[in-house]
Amino acid sequence: MKVLHICTTDGGGAGLCALRIHEAMLKQGIDSKVLVLIKKNDRNDVIRFCYLRRLLWRSINRMLRMLHLEITDYNYVTNLNINTGQCFTLPDTIYDVSQHPLVKDADVIHLQWVNGFIDYGTFFKKVKKPIIWTQHDENLFLGI
């Protein structure tokens, strides 16, 4: 069985939890891999997704925010977070994780903290594999 753990980052609580589950599966002889958007460590078994696209997207949005232009929902939510001290997230992203070779090769997908990484609207329509989603907080149903 091939299991793919998807997490926005391999740092922080959910990322570390994903790594612990990944390591436990490897010890049991399960073919386990980890796919992240933001890679915080130098482990070879953690694969970073499309770094250049993320860098370009963040740079463009940073410039738009500096010009006080809320052209995208991402910029609106970012400004809302800064101005209110709250932490809201969006269920859509620019990333199409469903087409990644690791997703296509996996038998089971294990989602951890996927804020800003998984585009809910397209991912669940395109991926027709068993999905396990570990909820580390209320983001899934509240967006915070």
Model-derived segments and their meaning:
Residues R65-F117:
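Conserved nucleotide-sugar donor-binding subdomain of glycosyltransferases
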